[in-house]
Amino acid sequence: MNFSVLPPEINSALMFAGAGPGPMLAAASAWTGLAGDLGSAAASFSAVTSQLATGSWQGPASAAMTGVAASYARWLTTAAAQAEQAAGQAQAAVSAFEAALAATVHPGAVSANRGRLRSLVASNLLGQNAPAIAAVEAVYEQMWAADVAAMLGYHGEASAVALSLTPFTPSPSAAATPGGAVIIAGFPFLDLGNVTIGGFNLASGNLGLGNLGSFNPGSANTGSVNLGNANIGDLNLGSGNIGSYNLGGGNTGDLNPGSGNTGTLNWGSGNIGSYNLGGGNLGSYNLGSGNTGDTNFGGGNTGNLNVGGGNTGNSNFGFGNTGNVNFGNGNTGDTNFGSGNLGSGNIGFGNKGSHNIGFGNSGNNNIGFGLTGDNQIGFGALNSGSGNLGFGNSGNGNIGFFNSGNNNIGMGNSGNGVGALSVEFGSSAERSSGFGNSGELSTGIGNSGQLSTGWFNSATTSTGWFNSGTTNTGWFNSGTTNTGIGNSGGNLVTGSMGLFNSGHTNTGSFNAGSMNTGDFNSGNVNTGYFNSGNINTGFFNSGDLNTGLFNSVNQPVQNSGWLHTGTNNSGYANAGTFNSGFDNNARDEHAEFVTGNSGLANVGNYNAGIINVGDHLSGFRNSVPTITGTANISGFVNAGTSISGFFNFGSLMSGFANFDDEVSGYLNGDSRASGWIH
């Protein structure tokens, strides 16, 4: 990692976050105790065998025993010395960390510096703060340099500590175990039918079991120094990650404090991208949730540099704008200052045209309100449109204020409304219901995606809050066709049913791998928990095709589990290929591709959940009317195509109990409707 390119906000946060030196001090103490125990055992064992050999036990058997015992005593003595060295190096690592921590700028000081800069910039109307701004920036550069020096020093000392460690010498009995592995904790390599319980690691210094790597306190990791389980990578504190330095679970990437992220350094869950503070973002540098784009401050925006929610475009400040550089709500166009304007360059509310100053003008370059035409100054009717009830409406058939669209019930809308039983405020979308929506046919608040039901969704046909992926049911999902919370997988095939999955087609939670049934799996097609290998049935397996626990070897079989018809299945009684779970059936019409299901009793391809029929479904009891074909459904008990939510029948739908096509909301029976009971 190149620490010199990371600002002090990141370097300081990385140093001050986490458990500190406590775990390493505990490890040093444990290694010291182990060294003492091994030394005592070596001395005691040598004394006992010497007394036997020089006493009553004589002959060839005694001589053979003496040779074996001497070899074992030497190994105990060597292991004691190596444990003592490990304790010393752990203490050296603690000293290196404490020195680096003392040299690192506190995050509070960095935050105060940036806050001071923002204050100076905001009040620098005449340039009077230029010297102070330069001074603040100079201090910030010093902070940057101090953090870089601390991190580089820490990296150098920690690397030296790691290089000086000597791998543990295998015990004299290691040659009798598979692959020369060292059996720890007294586990033999048991064989119970097709169930194996492996108790060994394929490297040294592990406290857990079934690891392919070194110095893992956890189990079933492929990598080194993982405190959690089933990680593929190094130095993960959580479980089920593919990557390194993750604090949460189910991430694909590095340095994520949250869970279910695909990317780097996301402070939140379910993001696809990097440096997001929030959840369910599809992009980078977002401070908020459910955004599609970069550097947004808020939720449900599609675009970049927006402050607010539900905007489609760039650099908007407000809600529900379609366009760029708008300050206000529900504007369609660019550079409007106000709300409900249909056009560009307006200052005011409800103007239908461009470059107007005032309210409810129909035309261009007007100053006033209620004017019809261009280049006028003055006051016209209360409403410049027809069939309006209210004030400042330039559209037609509105009930309310400052609407430039038609048939709205509400205020400040530039899009066209749905009609009775739907209320719109600050929306620029066609036929949407709610507040601040720029997505067509949406129901809720701040949706920039079309046909969405909920709050701050930036993708189409989603039901829930802060979803930036398409056809999700739940919260903070940036992937596609997920049912749950914080899932970033599924963009190429099907999403997952569960929580914080960055892989696709999982039934469970915190899976960075794909097509798993269970939790915290970083491998693929596993049924169980904490597996970093592939096609395993069980727990803590880092090898492939194992049925059991703590296995780090690859088995020469076609399936793991029991009673399968096909190949590469895990679990129980699956038919087809690449299924995990129980009683799933993957049709072979696309056999040249990787097909399969996770969960229980699914029929089709790429399904995650329970009793789904069709292709590309997640959730519970979803289906397509023709039994076969791609459905793209998430949620519960839906039938049709491209649906999220609950109890819907049709296509392109979100919400609850809708019956027809292109619908969002609740209990609607008409097509192209949003809201309630149309």
From Swiss-Prot:
This protein's record includes keyword Transmembrane helix: yes
Keyword Phosphoprotein attributed: no
Entry's localization field: Cell membrane
Any one GO BP annotation for this protein: response to host immune response
Listed name of the protein: Uncharacterized PPE family protein PPE21
InterPro entries attached to this UniProt entry: Mycobac_pentapep (IPR002989), PPE_dom (IPR000030), PPE_sf (IPR038332)
Spans traversing the lipid bilayer: 14-34, 180-200
Membrane topology listed for this record: Multi-pass membrane protein
Species of origin: Mycobacterium tuberculosis (strain CDC 1551 / Oshkosh)
Key words of the record: Cell membrane, Membrane, Transmembrane, Transmembrane helix
Family in the record: Belongs to the mycobacterial PPE family.
GO CC, any one term: plasma membrane
Highest taxon listed in the record's lineage: Bacteria
